[in-house]
Amino acid sequence: MTGFTGSAGNLLVTKQDARLFVDSRYYLQAEQQIAGSGILLMKEGLPGVPSLSQFILETLPGQTLGLDGRCVSLDQAKAWAKAVTVVDVDLISPLWQDRPALFTGAAFRLADHLAGRTAQDKLRDLRSQLKAAGAKAMLLTDLMDCAWLLNIRGQDIPHTPVVRMFVLAEAESLFLFMEDKAAAPIQAYLKELGAEIRPYDAVYAFLSRYGAGDTLLVTPSLSFALGQPLLERGVQLTESAWSARSRNFKTPGELKAIREAHIKDGVVMTRFLRWVKEQGGTGLDEAGAAARLDQMRLAAGCSDISFTTISAYGPNAALPHYSAPAQGSAKLEKKGLYLVDSGGQWPGATTDITRTVAMGPLTRAEKAHCTLVVRAMLALMDAAFPRGMDGSHVDVFARRPLWAAGLNYGHGTGHGVGAMLSVHEGPARINYGQQNTLPFQPGIVISDEPGLYFEGDHGVRMENLVECVELPTGMLGFVPLTMAPIDRDVLDPALMEPIDIRRLDAYHALVYDALSPYLHGEDLDYLENATQAL
């Protein structure tokens, strides 16, 4: 409809105009991609720019709002219904007649030692939730919840190993709504769980078994298409975040797999960083660099990348979620900054790492900004804080060095990460602008990724995944999971405090100890040099 290829955005079309609403990650990208289309760009978060919800509530009262109820949550639709009449209608399918069919791949069982808990154990916990709430069933609609609960993974969504399905669990029954092609390889296992397989689209009619007086536990992402008919029949819907919160706290088995995967991922990244720093001026472009890194991960035993690799040179790195075109992407030169944000799906684990490296000489501003971002990442990684604090509180550890310099960035500092699931896993997050997120507890895996972006010039981001742990003092803190060198060529030590240098040296000592047994020749030489004390 728009030509915008970002992963998040909303299009509102009225008789008068069309407006694309995006957050700060996509301001520049959306501006470029819809230029000349006549579509108005709404940069949510900027002063004076209403959010999509504000715009609907303030400018469309009394009107009728059509939406695809499968793609909008019940909560969101109910909020809009205070001002407009909401109608569930699919207006896109009649227009998009050559739309590719949804892909269905074979599902597979995740080994119990990787999951750390059996599906039977999780189902017992789920049913205890039903009993406590006096509910007849729990309906899971989030694909990550479904995969986590059943200890299965799939191939239905690019780079996110989930199965397209719904799970409906009652006290004595378990119904899975999924395609036969996906279920076939694990039929025997699903039978062990007592599951009855139904067609994916049959869920809408099947839910008619519930009526007035029944209570269903539902996930916060329940769609309008599923939830509204239940409400109209008098079913009591009670939101439950049990599954999402449970999978945020990784089991010992999951953490073991995650730590092992980060060693393998770090070996790949170190080999790539050595190679790419030698490619300035050779004709290598952003797309070619990304392809090389993706191939290296797959060759090392990764089943898939965890998201489309962000490979950005020079001014393109100022777009936080830049996507290099397959043809005609920028060539890496012997100067300036190159940013690569990438990750993989390893057995039982998902990785996500960003490094910004010097391809040659840097300007004073580029070095200053890189130094600030590294200081920010290390400060959060070394933070100590009491129990009860969430991501809106600890964000200040990362942003303080930047704020002191009069700088900031528009995206969150951290997002939860799944265990061979989605690279973005809620409700854990680090963002001072989002209150009441999941309080930190040991076992949460989250990213630490501050950045700075200067339109038309350069961008910097550094990212490690970290694990929340209890410190010897009894406070909570983080330990790094990501193991890969931070390019010292981007740093100006004169702009670092002694504590910053100690933190960097300590991290690099960990990286060397973790990776050196698995690297040889030029790669080991590079690691030794890259992790020398500053």
What spans do the regions from the language model cover?
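Active-site neighborhoods and metal-handling regions in enzymes and metal-associated proteins
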Residues: 1-534
